[in-house]
């Protein structure tokens, strides 16, 4: 029979599909017919296929068995036809439909009683004809599903003999191997899933990044350059730092990657400055050793939070020196620099000039007694260190003295007309966040003044002027140039990103305290060179995320920091979800353990987790893990339910895309959860349960088919927010990562095999609130 082959589908051995495959395997073994047999995960039932014309096949197991019997000896087949054909008819028309839906003990008792009657009224042989083949596989199916076969003496006695015969033993082994890819030893085998078992519309997939290939702007595509504020190297980021810049930018970058936009996300540690010098002195190491240590710590934190930079660099590089000095020299030659003598605070104890942030005292504006010399955390106002009441050196608490020193100033007053014209246009075109606009307008309205951009330090980018040898560039002139140099360390073709305003849009994410440096000082520096640069298109800022009753404080042990969040034992997705749903987009927000637990249990678990798990388990139980044959036209079947469902999802999806395009990340997450909730409602509206499956087959298939496709969409739209959760959903669906579409498409097609259902989330016990609050200083002591 070289022109034929048998294909056996993947299935659980407790399924009736497995029993049907076993029929054919017994026939191959018992009738000594040489026909090739192969596993075929892309089919739903056992098939006899014409090898030369594979589109032609028979998928009825009894018909295949009868054909193989006829091929063995035509005379025997004719004799069989006349005497036992009615038993096969009964088996196909009566037994099989009930076997497919059997679930309860009563269901199997009915099947066994019918089989016992067959044995009473007919001569059943101890050898194989098509009838014995069918009965053997039927009884095997009942045994594997826990049916009380021993209570039926005739069929149980016969089965005990037949299951030991060589054809049955060989057939069982063959079916296991072809069905599962390996011999099975328990009743809980998992159906193998792979790309060969997929039936997915491949026109809507997310474009994969090629490992090792540098991302460069492309013509005729959206080229999106994203940065997040460079974290200062010797600070361990707390949750507020993370959501304020790196996590927010990561969501935006992942969204645009999932839209198949050409996207580059750059960040790195800001490593120069007084703070590094002083911290290194405290720890007894060199500044470079300190930076190496903390750069690795930052990278570890961001990796755990699944923040996916295209490149995470640092500012202490030769390229930083070269680019920063180039910009400085251009500004100097263009007469946008001025030299002046200024008075600085000097600590006579450790013999060094003090950067503003290393002078502490009482704020003259609000009376906050822990203000820094550059800014007050109490009122948010910018300060001059000399304005502080009772100033102290942060390092040794000595009272600093005043000393004169010569420095270079950036003439922001000369640059104001250019930067003001640019800012007003960019704020409108780029739809800046409210904080970005208001803070910038406030600075410009007050009038820009020359700002000192050099410091008396050793650790920094050297000032490229001979008379200033021994001085370095001030970190807030130097640090923002780090975005450019970090890109230059990523690719030698960095100018295609940073000198290409016609093709590239620059999006920058940060906390509100960093706004002036990105909307005034950095743009002024670029404009003053007279060269073509990619300028800020959109700035996105956050207010402050506070902790319980106050502020995060590493020194006081208050709050969760990046290197301690993982100790709690929850997945990064749980943290990302809460932080982004509480993102301080328009005002300060508060992290509380009570809300953290409540949102996890009532939103992640009860909404998204429930919908995904319920649908996938139903598909596995009722459809053997295959996407059922649903009607793809939403106007056909199920009245208005399906059409309204599609309409609602598309309306929410449009709002989701609009929110993400505007970098309204919290609103986008809320809409994603609303789409998931609409999926739960759709299942409830269709009353998906065993009764629906048994008596409204097409309605049930439609509902499950659409629900599975909605889960595929949810995996895509949650990818920016909870990438590992989306990866788990893709794995459970056995589907490749999907692009985020403009409108919802049905991409999981009938016959596609899903993977093994798993829980996305598990409940957090409410009692953990007090334990975590106590451990992380949330009792109001701060």
Curated annotation (Swiss-Prot):
EC number(s) per entry: 6.1.1.10
Gene Ontology MF: a single term: methionine-tRNA ligase activity
'KMSKS' region, short sequence motif: residues: 551-555
Name the record gives this protein: Probable methionine--tRNA ligase, cytoplasmic
Disulfide bonds: none
Gene that encodes the chain: rar1
Enzyme class of the recorded protein, top EC level: ligase
Entry GO CC: aminoacyl-tRNA synthetase multienzyme complex; cytoplasmic stress granule; cytosol; methionyl glutamyl tRNA synthetase complex
GO biological process, any: methionyl-tRNA aminoacylation
Primary subcellular site in the record, as a coarse category: cytoplasm
PROSITE patterns: AA_TRNA_LIGASE_I (PS00178)
Organism of derivation: Schizosaccharomyces pombe (strain 972 / ATCC 24843)
Catalytic activity as recorded in UniProt: tRNA(Met) + L-methionine + ATP = L-methionyl-tRNA(Met) + AMP + diphosphate
Keyword Nucleotide-binding applies: yes
Keywords from the UniProt entry: Aminoacyl-tRNA synthetase, ATP-binding, Cytoplasm, Ligase, Nucleotide-binding, Protein biosynthesis
Short motif 'HIGH' region, span: 231-241
SUPFAM superfamilies: Anticodon-binding domain of a subclass of class I aminoacyl-tRNA synthetases, Methionyl-tRNA synthetase (MetRS), Zn-domain, Nucleotidylyl transferase
Subcellular location: Cytoplasm
Stated family: Belongs to the class-I aminoacyl-tRNA synthetase family.
């Amino acid at each position: 029979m070289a022109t034929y082959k048998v294909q056996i589908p993947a299935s659980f051995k407790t399924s009736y599909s497995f029993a049907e495959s076993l029929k054919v395997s017994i026939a191959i073994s018992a009738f000594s017919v040489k026909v090739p047999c192969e596993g075929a995960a892309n089919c739903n039932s056992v098939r006899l296929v014409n090898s030369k014309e594979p589109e032609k096949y028979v998928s009825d197991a009894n018909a295949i068995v009868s054909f193989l019997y006829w091929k063995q000896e035509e005379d025997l087949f004719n004799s069989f036809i006349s005497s036992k054909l009615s038993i096969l008819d009964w088996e196909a028309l009566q037994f099989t439909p009930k076997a497919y839906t059997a679930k309860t003990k009563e269901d199997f008792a009915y099947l066994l009683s019918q089989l016992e009657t067959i044995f009473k009224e007919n001569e059943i042989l101890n050898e194989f004809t098509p009838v014995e083949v069918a009965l053997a596989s039927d009884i095997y199916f009942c045994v594997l599903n826990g049916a009380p076969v021993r209570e039926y003496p005739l069929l149980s006695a016969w089965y005990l003999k037949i299951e030991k015969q060589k054809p049955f033993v060989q057939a069982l082994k063959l079916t296991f191997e072809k069905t599962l890819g390996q011999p099975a030893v328990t009743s809980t085998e998992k159906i193998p899933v792979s790309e060969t078992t997929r039936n997915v519309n491949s026109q809507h997939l997310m474009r994969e990044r090629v490992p090792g290939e540098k991302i460069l702007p492309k013509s005729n595509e959206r080229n999106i350059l994203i940065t997040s504020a460079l974290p200062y190297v010797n600070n361990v980021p707390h949750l507020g730092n993370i959501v304020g810049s790196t996590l927010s930018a990561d969501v935006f970058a992942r969204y645009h990657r999932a839209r198949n936009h050409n996207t580059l996300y750059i960040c790195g540690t800001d490593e120069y400055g007084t703070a590094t010098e002083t911290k290194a002195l405290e720890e007894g190491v060199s500044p470079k050793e300190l930076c190496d240590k903390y750069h690795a710590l930052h990278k570890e934190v961001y990796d755990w939070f699944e923040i996916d930079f295209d490149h995470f660099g640092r500012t202490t590089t030769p390229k930083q020196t070269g680019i920063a000095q180039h910009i400085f020299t251009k500004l100097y030659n263009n007469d946008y620099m001025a030299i002046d003598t200024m008075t600085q605070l000097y600590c006579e104890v450790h013999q060094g000039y003090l950067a503003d942030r290393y002078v502490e005292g009482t704020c003259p504006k609000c009376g906050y007694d822990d203000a820094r010399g550059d800014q007050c955390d109490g009122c948010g106002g910018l300060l001059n260190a000399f304005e502080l009441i009772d100033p102290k050196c942060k390092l040794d608490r000595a009272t600093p003295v005043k000393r004169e020193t010569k420095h270079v100033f950036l003439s922001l007053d000369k640059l104001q007309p250019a930067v003001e014209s640019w800012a007003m246009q960019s704020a409108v075109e780029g739809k800046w966040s409210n904080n970005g606009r208001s803070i910038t307008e406030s600075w410009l309205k007050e009038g820009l003044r020359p700002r000192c951009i050099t410091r008396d330090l050793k650790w920094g980018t050297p000032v490229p002027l001979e008379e200033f040898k021994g001085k370095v560039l001030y970190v807030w002139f130097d640090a923002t140039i780090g975005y450019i140099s970090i890109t230059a360390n990523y690719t030698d073709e960095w100018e295609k990103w940073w000198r290409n305003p016609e093709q590239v849009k620059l999006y920058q994410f940060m906390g509100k305290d960093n706004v002036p440096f990105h909307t005034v000082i950095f743009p002024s520096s670029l404009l003053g060179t007279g060269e073509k640069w990619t300028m800020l298109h959109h700035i996105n800022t956050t207010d402050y995320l506070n902790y319980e009753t106050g502020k995060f404080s590493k020194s006081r042990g208050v709050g969760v920091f990046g290197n301690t969040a993982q100790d709690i034992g929850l997945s990064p997705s749980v943290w990302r979800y809460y932080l982004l749903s509480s993102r301080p987009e328009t005002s300060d927000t508060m992290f509380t353990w009570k809300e953290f637990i409540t949102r996890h249990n009532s939103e992640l678990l009860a909404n998204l987790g429930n919908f995904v798990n319920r649908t996938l388990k139903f598909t596995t139980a009722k459809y053997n893990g295959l996407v059922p044959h649903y009607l793809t036209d939403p106007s056909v079947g199920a009245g208005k339910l399906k059409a309204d469902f599609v309409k609602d999802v598309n309306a929410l999806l449009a709002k989701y895309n609009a929110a993400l395009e505007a970098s309204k990340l919290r609103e986008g997450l809320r809409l994603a959860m609303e789409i998931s909730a609409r999926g739960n409602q759709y299942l409830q509206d269709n009353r998906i349960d065993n009764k629906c499956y048994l008596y409204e087959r097409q309605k049930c298939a439609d509902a499950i088919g659409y629900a599975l496709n909605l889960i595929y969409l949810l995996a895509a739209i949650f990818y920016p927010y909870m990438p590992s959760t989306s990866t788990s959903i893709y794995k459970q669906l056995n589907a490749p990562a999907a692009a985020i579409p403009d409108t919802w498409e049905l991409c999981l097609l009938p016959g596609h095999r899903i993977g093994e259902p798993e829980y996305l989330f598990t409940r957090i016990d409410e009692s953990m609130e007090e334990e975590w609050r106590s451990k992380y200083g949330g009792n109001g002591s701060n």
